[in-house]
Amino acid sequence: MRQILIAVAIALAVAILLTPVLIRLFTRQGFGHEIREDGPPSHHKKRGTPSMGGVAIIAGIWVSYFGTHLVGVLMDGKGPSASGLLVLGLATSLGVVGFLDDLIKLRRARNLGLNKTAKTVGILVAAVLFGVLALQFRNADGLTPGSAELSYVREIATVTLAPAVFVLFCVVVVSAWSNAVNFTDGLDGLAAGAMAMVCAAYVLITFWQFRNACATAPGVGCYNVRDPLDLAIIAAATAGACIGFLWWNAAPAKIFMGDTGSLALGGIIAGLSVTSRTEMLAVVLGALFVAEVTSVVVQILAFRTTGRRVFRMAPFHHHFELVGWAETTVIIRFWLLTAIACGLGVALFYSEWLTTVGA
């Protein structure tokens, strides 16, 4: 628990101190965000707000992770794990794709960055590498960071994927979550606040897995997760970094995370869900992100098949703005829904454990 608190504190401090530095730097460089002409009229005043603030989030997570492990090595001799480095590697790779996308947008002074093919290839490469490596690095207990068995709260033994199918599954998971968080990042502080809550839920889940790991506490209801404490540290660091960034990103935002941050944060959810064996539970925890990306898919399918739109604008947080909700009202209500979803997800996780142990 001490390491988790250290991780939160370091990440929060780095993000909250580095973000204003980036604001000044990007403002001097003229790296102002371009706004869609067909977006809500209230967003036009945001034109010129610095973007690429996700750099502060990623930096906060990395500094926190290694800072926490430096303390950990001094206390118990344990350093970074394969699971932790894989999750951070995935998030950083996606962050690089997002950074290039943001940079091109800012250089061209238009809301179009990497073309779809280049962006898709970048995400695909990161996802494939993650999927392949997730089945490597077997520890002394025979556990790898990922599992070929499909998981809800723990592995479903009746559904085992072939290695190639598992990699394809990882591609779907990574692509879905990175795009889901990316679509959600359309209102000041919405994605950062929601992400902090999802990661807080993952801290509880992975720490519980650590306290009830089969490797150290074998018995009914134990969890076969390779590095649960390290995953808890990453979740805590991400929550702290998002809160620190939110200090400057809350409405009215002084900086946006950009694709640099949103793609990286999507990678965090994808990586945590695979390495903690909770791919299906993550859909509940991240219900807001799922709803946002679903609204985009529904809008596209409806328009292509019927020529009509279901929402005034997608992602659907813009729909509520266009029907008269104030931006801050949408944000706060969506945060409340995220808190409810996270509470439900944690409750489902814990109730499954109670059922398993017969409590």
Swiss-Prot record:
Question: Which InterPro entries does its entry note?
Answer: Glycosyl_transferase_4, PNAcMuramoyl-5peptid_Trfase, PNAcMuramoyl-5peptid_Trfase_CS
For the protein in the UniProt heading, the enzyme class is transferase
For this entry, list what GO says about its biological process: cell division; cell wall organization; peptidoglycan biosynthetic process; regulation of cell shape
UniProt function note: Catalyzes the initial step of the lipid cycle reactions in the biosynthesis of the cell wall peptidoglycan: transfers peptidoglycan precursor phospho-MurNAc-pentapeptide from UDP-MurNAc-pentapeptide onto the lipid carrier undecaprenyl phosphate, yielding undecaprenyl-pyrophosphoryl-MurNAc-pentapeptide, known as lipid I.
Q: How does it sit in the membrane?
A: Multi-pass membrane protein
Q: Which reaction does it catalyse?
A: UDP-N-acetyl-alpha-D-muramoyl-L-alanyl-gamma-D-glutamyl-meso-2,6-diaminopimeloyl-D-alanyl-D-alanine + di-trans,octa-cis-undecaprenyl phosphate = di-trans,octa-cis-undecaprenyl diphospho-N-acetyl-alpha-D-muramoyl-L-alanyl-D-glutamyl-meso-2,6-diaminopimeloyl-D-alanyl-D-alanine + UMP
Q: Which family does it belong to?
A: Belongs to the glycosyltransferase 4 family. MraY subfamily.
Q: Where are the membrane-spanning stretches?
A: 3-23, 55-75, 84-104, 117-137, 156-176, 190-210, 231-251, 255-275, 283-303, 330-350
Q: Which gene encodes it?
A: mraY
Task: Write down the superkingdom of origin.
Answer: Bacteria
- Cofactor(s) named in the record: Mg(2+)
What GO MF annotations does this protein's record show? metal ion binding; phospho-N-acetylmuramoyl-pentapeptide-transferase activity; UDP-N-acetylmuramoyl-L-alanyl-D-glutamyl-meso-2,6-diaminopimelyl-D-alanyl-D-alanine:undecaprenyl-phosphate transferase activity
One GO term describing the cellular component: plasma membrane
Cell location: Cell membrane
Q: What is this protein called?
A: Phospho-N-acetylmuramoyl-pentapeptide-transferase
